[in-house]
């Protein structure tokens, strides 16, 4: 029986794992995908809006070649954090069910049953697309996540979204269409 199971191996899940380790808890961080799976799925040429120091966890310095780090630098940084802290990770291990057993929680995962006194859920929102329920959104050419502009060459494109990411996608796809 673990003291703590953390679901989600993104930056918040890793920060929780570091705190668990500092407090000598028997813990495990599990994720249905890879380490910082959502960051891996960001567009390849992503540059963060935050400076490197705002993304730091566990007193490990995040050194970037620029004022704002890239996706590649972030992936390397979070691997370094895990190695530095020797975090307990169980990757590619999806949780299918969580049962409250009064004195503890039972988690059914693809690798078997896990039991823990406490759980923290740090799954984020990246894997849950916001669907608009409009005709055509189920077509093969409609994507819910953007990676790069190449697939949109010579196509009319509609971008549904708001904020900085939508503007970045609009600028990137516009440069590939022209």
Residue ranges, per PLM feature:
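Rossmann-like dinucleotide/flavin-binding elements
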Residues: 1, 6-32, 145-178
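FAD-binding core/adjacent interface of flavoenzyme oxidoreductases
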Residues: 1-7, 22, 37, 41, ...
């Amino acid at each position: 029986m673990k003291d703590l199971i953390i679901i989600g191996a993104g930056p918040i899940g890793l920060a929780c794992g570091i705190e668990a380790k500092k407090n000598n808890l028997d813990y495990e961080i599990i994720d249905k995908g890879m380490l910082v799976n959502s960051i891996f799925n960001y567009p390849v040429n992503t540059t963060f809006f935050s400076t490197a120091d705002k993304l730091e966890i566990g007193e490990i310095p995040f050194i970037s070649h620029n004022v704002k780090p890239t996706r590649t630098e972030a992936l390397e940084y979070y691997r370094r954090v895990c190695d530095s802290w020797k975090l307990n990770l169980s990757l590619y291990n999806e949780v299918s069910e969580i049962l409250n057993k009064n004195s503890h929680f039972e988690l059914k995962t693809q690798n078997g049953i896990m039991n823990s006194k406490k759980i923290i859920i740090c799954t984020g929102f990246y894997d849950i697309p916001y669907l608009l329920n409009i005709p055509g959104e189920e077509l093969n050419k409609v994507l819910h996540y953007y990676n790069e502009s190449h697939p949109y060459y010579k196509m009319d494109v509609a971008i549904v979204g708001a904020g900085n990411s939508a503007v970045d996608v609009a600028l990137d796809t516009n440069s590939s269409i022209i």
